[in-house]
């Protein structure tokens, strides 16, 4: 009898240890992406009316996120909830910038991204080191940011929105599609685009087709690529298809086999998405992602074309807050000065 009691005590102890381990794992995972405003409660009706927009605010280019937010908020009557994502050491500065500027009226939540989630998943070598910044991979983890919403918009920080964001949010996603992107071959004014020397618009520019792992995918290198700087995502499908896990798998494969970090496109975050979403995404109206404004400081779009655009994206090295850059006047019209005086424009006349 005493032996049986002792065995039961041991089994009970092991059960408690196991439960504690599971609980710790869940809590630890939850800290990778932590929402400062998780205590805020919202009714189902309020959540239905909200348009969640995720945008990252990196330390060295926080003014970009603020300009993007200003342009979105100023051009719509919709109820926008901004999820502003940053690293721990920038969260107080993000809040100060919003609350001590014209942006104080926006509805927002500040979210901390813990880069520990990326440990062992990123190769250190890249033709563009800035693309290795942790916040560049936030788009992979949208379901850990958005818990209440079925649909979400993700935007890169180097964009300006000139249309009503409600139109972008209303983008139709086909059954079984977790996201919508802009096809690189569907850009308007393609004759202007082709003058941008070195621009990549096919999978060949992002994947290394010399590697067997890439060849085995069976994807033609001439397949049109897409740009993940503007995403309309369905969170239910994203979770159902385990998109985040798939993306992490292709990050890990790149660490082991160097599948795309040396590609012409330099698309460290783009390449895994091209693989995971191949043939399984919906498309965004081309006017809602006019891009490559940061590709070449000597190439300009026509003013009429830019006025028609709903969203402008300065992807590339030449950002509108730096010099040299093009069409920076359009970006500056939405710039919100930094209350702390840290972020400054680098233009000859600024």
Swiss-Prot record:
Domain of life: Eukaryota
Cellular location(s): Membrane
Parts of the chain on the Cytoplasmic side: 1-6
Keywords: Glycoprotein, Glycosyltransferase, Membrane, Signal-anchor, Transferase, Transmembrane, Transmembrane helix
Lumenal side: 25-349
InterPro entries: Glyco_trans_8, Glycosyltrans_8_dom-fam, Nucleotide-diphossugar_trans
Glycosylation sites: 234
PANTHER family tied to this protein: GLYCOSYLTRANSFERASE 8 DOMAIN-CONTAINING PROTEIN, GLYCOSYLTRANSFERASE 8 DOMAIN-CONTAINING PROTEIN 2
Name of this protein: Glycosyltransferase 8 domain-containing protein 2
Highest classification ranks of the organism: Eukaryota, Metazoa, Chordata, Craniata, Vertebrata
């Amino acid at each position: 009898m005493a032996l049986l009691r002792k065995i039961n005590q041991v089994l009970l102890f092991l059960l408690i240890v196991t439960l504690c381990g599971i609980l710790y794992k869940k809590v630890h995972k939850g800290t990778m992406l932590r929402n400062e405003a998780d205590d805020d409660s919202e009714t189902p009706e309020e959540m239905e009316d909200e348009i969640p927009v995720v945008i990252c605010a990196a330390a060295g280019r926080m003014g970009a996120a603020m300009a993007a937010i200003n342009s979105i908020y100023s051009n719509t009557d919709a109820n926008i909830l901004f999820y502003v994502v940053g690293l721990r050491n920038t969260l107080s500065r993000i809040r100060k910038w919003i609350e001590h500027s014209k942006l104080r009226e926006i509805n927002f939540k500040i979210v901390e991204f813990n880069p520990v989630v990326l440990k062992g998943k990123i190769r250190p070598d890249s033709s563009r080191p800035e693309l290795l910044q942790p916040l560049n991979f936030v788009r992979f983890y949208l379901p850990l940011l958005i818990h209440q919403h079925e649909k979400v918009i993700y935007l890169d920080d180097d964009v300006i929105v000139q249309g009503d964001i409600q139109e972008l949010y209303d983008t139709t996603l086909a059954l079984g599609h977790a996201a919508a992107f802009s096809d690189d071959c569907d850009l308007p004014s393609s004759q202007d685009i082709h003058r941008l020397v070195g621009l990549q618009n096919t999978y060949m520019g992002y994947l290394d087709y010399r590697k067997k792992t890439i060849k085995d995918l069976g994807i033609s290198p001439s397949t049109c690529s897409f740009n993940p700087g503007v995403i309309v995502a369905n969170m239910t499908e994203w979770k159902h298809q385990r998109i985040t896990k798939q993306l992490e798998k292709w990050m890990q494969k790149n660490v082991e086999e160097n599948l795309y970090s040396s590609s012409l496109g330099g698309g460290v975050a783009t390449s895994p998405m091209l693989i995971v979403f191949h043939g399984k995404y919906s498309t965004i109206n081309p006017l809602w992602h006019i891009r490559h404004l940061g590709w070449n400081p000597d190439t300009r779009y026509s003013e009429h074309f830019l006025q028609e655009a709903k969203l402008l994206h300065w992807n590339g090295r030449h950002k509108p807050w730096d010099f040299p850059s093009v069409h920076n006047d359009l970006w500056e019209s939405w710039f919100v000065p930094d209350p702390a005086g840290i972020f400054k424009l680098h233009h000859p006349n600024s």
